[in-house]
């Protein structure tokens, strides 16, 4: 077949050495398969303008979610056209919307987990984002601490009060 050159720009937060390093690693890896990626560091205010206007090929961003996770804000179709909204890529998917709506009404942890797994599978198949990595987090615990509960998302944050046993 005919070889068609592929080139795109990756915008990274210019003050972040981490994002610049990750961008350059991807650039080198993509070059090995004939893809040209231009890493463009940009200051935060300019980066946000590009994101809000959806003027980018690819961009590095970090999502930090608190418990419980709110899938609607980032993934629901109703959020896709909101100016300066969190559904940055304009993702729309009727099945995703149904799962999100079911999650908002479900309180059983086991059922919520299954719905979240269905949702994650759908994101994997649709690929509106490519998730590169999650930072490692260290968490400590001592038996003297009572009422300690670690959540799956951001286990280092515990909104429940704990106390020393005695």
Segments and roles (model prediction):
Residues 1-3, 90:
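Flexible hinge/switch segments at interdomain interfaces of large molecular machines
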Residues 4-15, 37-40, 57, 158:
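Short, well-ordered beta-strand elements
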Residues 14, 18-28, 48-166:
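Detector for C-terminal structural segments
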Residues 25-39:
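Short alpha-helix C-terminal cap/hinge motif
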